[in-house]
């Protein structure tokens, strides 16, 4: 039943200790016990993914890299567009999640999709360049997220697309045209998410905007499951390599 599956997920998110000597071990410790029930709960928890992936142009014969792509559920949001791509890579450090992704690709018959267990700050596609790089609620879980963005910049072709959807908190004094978050939002969500090693940052968007030409930006909020009184801030960013 969905309720009991949710309770198992919430146990792992809120109470189960996260152990490991490095980031890969901590990721597997966190996700290993919830991998089977991951997609249904995250579909309700992580908003904006479907809209982001459907909005991005699918270049014919192109290379798409989904960094921190986990179970590969994001790729389903490409719909028929996946068949237009030459190669899709889902890169993650959790082998439990990648196993589900590999099974998903096999079931759909997506022979051009491949899972890669690797570090998002270092891995590069064997083709040498990518047309699209996406991060879906993964930047906040990458300790060196600056390095992950710089790695994406290196692998993208000139004019290539980067697209990010994630939690965030706004700066106290944001740049002109960006949303300002109040004291509660700026001081509640960072420690709230930090218990799961998720770190919403006021610096994601300014850094992305400094490194890429902004194509589209949406700043919004949504209600989390079982937390009806609070709305969590998130953003969708699409940029182009300058």
Task: Give short role names for the model-derived ranges.
Residues 236-242:
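C-terminal lobe and adjacent flexible extensions of AdoMet/dcAdoMet transferase-like proteins
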Residues 121-133:
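A short acidic, Gly/Pro-enriched loop at the edge of an enzyme's catalytic core
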Residues 63-122:
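Class I SAM-dependent methyltransferase SAM/SAH-binding core
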Residues 2-59, 73-77, 100, 177, ...:
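Conserved class I S-adenosyl-L-methionine
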Residues 131-144:
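A short SAM/SAH-binding and catalytic strip from SAM-dependent methyltransferases
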Residues 18-21, 25, 165-229:
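C-terminal alpha-helical "lid/dimerization" subdomain adjacent to the S-adenosyl-L-methionine
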Residues 146-158:
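A short glycine-rich, Lys/Arg-flanked "PGG" loop and its adjoining helix->strand segment in the class I
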Residues 83, 142-143, 156-157:
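Helix-to-beta-strand junctions that scaffold the AdoMet/dcAdoMet cofactor pocket
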